[in-house]
């Protein structure tokens, strides 16, 4: 039952015409996005618990944006839109969090999460697309 549920979740936006490589990339990105959702929510709760209420909105906005992009992808099956939305979210959320926390000293290594944007471009698109990120 669990395997069937996971397979169904990873089949969001499935297109019967996609190649095996496209299917793998789609399922991987959907899986990564779904796994990060609860972590982003908990991350926001931790900021809230330590009194950083404004900063808590950053990971919660990431979770909301990610969920919306997944819902849009489920309807439109436009992988490029999902990929771009996820890359923008993973680039902007940590940068905003770092700024809101007062810079690099106060935010520790939160900014390092931004490195996932170019890595995502390599993994889910083609390597040449990593440079703009």
Question: Where would I find each of the regions flagged by the language model?
Answer:
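The cytoplasmic-loop to transmembrane-helix boundary for the fourth helix
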Residues: 124-133
């Amino acid at each position: 039952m669990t395997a069937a549920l996971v397979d169904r979740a990873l089949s969001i936006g499935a297109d019967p015409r996609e190649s095996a490589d496209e299917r793998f990339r789609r399922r991987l990105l959907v899986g990564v996005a779904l796994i990060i959702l609860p972590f982003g929510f908990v991350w926001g709760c931790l900021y809230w618990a330590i009194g950083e209420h404004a900063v808590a909105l950053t990971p919660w906005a990431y979770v909301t944006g990610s969920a919306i992009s997944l819902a849009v992808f489920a309807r439109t099956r436009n992988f490029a839109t999902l990929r771009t939305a996820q890359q923008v979210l993973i680039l902007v959320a940590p940068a905003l969090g770092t700024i809101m926390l007062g810079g690099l000293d106060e935010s520790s290594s939160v900014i390092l999460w931004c490195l996932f944007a170019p890595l995502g471009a390599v993994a889910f698109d083609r390597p040449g697309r990593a440079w703009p990120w």
